[in-house]
């Protein structure tokens, strides 16, 4: 029965589920920003949190600069654009303007902040381990909209910093937020990037070779692998075991073709929990004994560790953002069974 698989809010215990884009998802507002929590600590066994942030343009920072000592934070731009700043220790401060499909990696103890640029912006945050949503429950106001609007329109002044003020943010250490109020975001961005010697939307981006360093991958400009075992799937890793270290997870996008009639859709099962959010196309997922369910843009499927699942693309081209607990999940299996690939599109023939 599909109806029992689909939920309006992430469950308070670990079970398979699908949650639609812009579901209530225990939404809260923090000033003009609206946060939804599609996967939470309790729903994932504290493996990871997957949250959506929708917000309008702002002339000010979305949050004051801070670090996390225990949580590895990932920023993915679904649509619109936002600027992300990150600095590790005494290293050079980095900043990029992220647009659709771009990714920013903020490991533990990296000072960071962001600013929403476009009126129709959505960020997906993947935070490891799970449970970081408790901060937003504490800071935010429960959203009570009945239309599932991406964010609640406001005529408020967009020039003041969103989120907790300097005195409040300094009291949030129990939520793993450590204010870095002396951090000054650099303002010398040219063509979406600073410092000047950095590559952004003009050439290849690599994942960090040194664990703990922040890094950025522009849409389509990172490493890619083509798996041809079950139709075509292109895995673009964002976080591997090298970067995750003891946080023990992987993060990728997976772009997929339809499944040829000669191929049987495989059944998968992994020790760690995993989830994916559809970014483009239509993806059918069948989890455990639940009926097959079609997911559209923004929809999220969560699969607990040890539960069998199948998935395939109903559209000619679909793309998902995929997170897995552990270092040997679906994305890594597809990479291991594939080959390095230079294109974002799959071959023209089977």
Swiss-Prot record:
GO MF assignments: metal ion binding; quercetin 2,3-dioxygenase activity
Annotated protein name in UniProt: Quercetin 2,3-dioxygenase
Low complexity biased stretches: 152-167
PTM annotation: The N-linked glycan at Asn-191 consists of Man(5)-GlcNAc(2).
Residues annotated to bind Cu cation: 66, 68, 73, 112
Region annotation Disordered: where it falls in the sequence: 148-167
Summary of the function given for this chain in its UniProt record: Performs the first step in the degradation of the flavonoid quercetin by a dioxygenase reaction. The enzyme catalyzes the cleavage of the O-heteroaromatic ring of the flavonol quercetin yielding the depside 2-protocatechuoyl-phloroglucinol carboxylic acid and carbon monoxide. This involves the remarkable dioxygenolytic cleavage of two carbon-carbon bonds.
Subunit structure: Homodimer.
CDD domains linked: cupin_QDO_C (cd20281), cupin_QDO_N_C (cd02215)
Source organism phylogeny: Eukaryota, Fungi, Dikarya, Ascomycota, Pezizomycotina
Binding site for substrate: 66, 73
């Amino acid at each position: 029965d599909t109806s029992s698989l689909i939920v309006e809010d992430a469950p308070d215990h670990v079970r398979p589920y699908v949650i639609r884009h812009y579901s209530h998802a225990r939404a809260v507002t923090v000033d003009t920003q609206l946060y939804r929590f599609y996967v939470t600590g309790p729903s994932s066994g504290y493996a990871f949190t997957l949250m959506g942030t929708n917000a309008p343009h702002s002339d000010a920072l979305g949050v004051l600069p801070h670090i996390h000592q225990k949580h590895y934070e990932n920023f993915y731009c679904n649509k619109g654009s936002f600027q992300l700043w990150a600095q590790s220790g005494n290293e050079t401060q980095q900043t990029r303007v992220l647009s659709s499909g771009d990714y920013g990696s903020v490991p533990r103890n990296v000072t960071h902040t962001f600013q929403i640029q476009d009126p129709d912006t959505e960020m997906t945050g993947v935070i490891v381990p799970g449970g970081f949503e408790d901060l937003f429950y504490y800071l935010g106001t429960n959203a009570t909209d009945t239309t599932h609007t991406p964010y609640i329109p406001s005529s408020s002044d967009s020039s003041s910093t969103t989120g907790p003020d300097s005195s409040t943010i300094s009291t949030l250490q129990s939520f793993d937020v450590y204010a870095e109020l002396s951090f000054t975001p650099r303002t010398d961005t040219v063509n979406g990037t600073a410092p000047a010697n950095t590559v952004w939307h003009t050439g290849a981006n690599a994942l960090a070779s040194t664990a703990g360093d922040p890094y950025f991958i522009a849409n389509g400009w990172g490493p890619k692998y083509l798996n041809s075992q079950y139709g075509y799937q292109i895995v673009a890793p964002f976080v591997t075991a090298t970067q995750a270290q003891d946080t023990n997870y992987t993060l990728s996008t997976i772009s997929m073709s339809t499944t040829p009639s000669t191929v049987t859709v495989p059944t998968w099962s992994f020790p760690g929990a995993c989830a994916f959010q559809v970014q483009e196309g239509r993806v059918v997922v069948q989890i455990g004994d639940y009926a097959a369910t079609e997911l559209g843009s923004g929809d999220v499927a969560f699969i607990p560790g040890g539960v069998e699942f199948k998935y395939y693309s109903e559209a000619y081209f679909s793309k998902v953002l995929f997170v897995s607990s552990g270092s040997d999940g679906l994305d890594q299996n597809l990479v291991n069974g594939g080959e390095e690939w230079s294109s974002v599109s799959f071959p023209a023939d089977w």
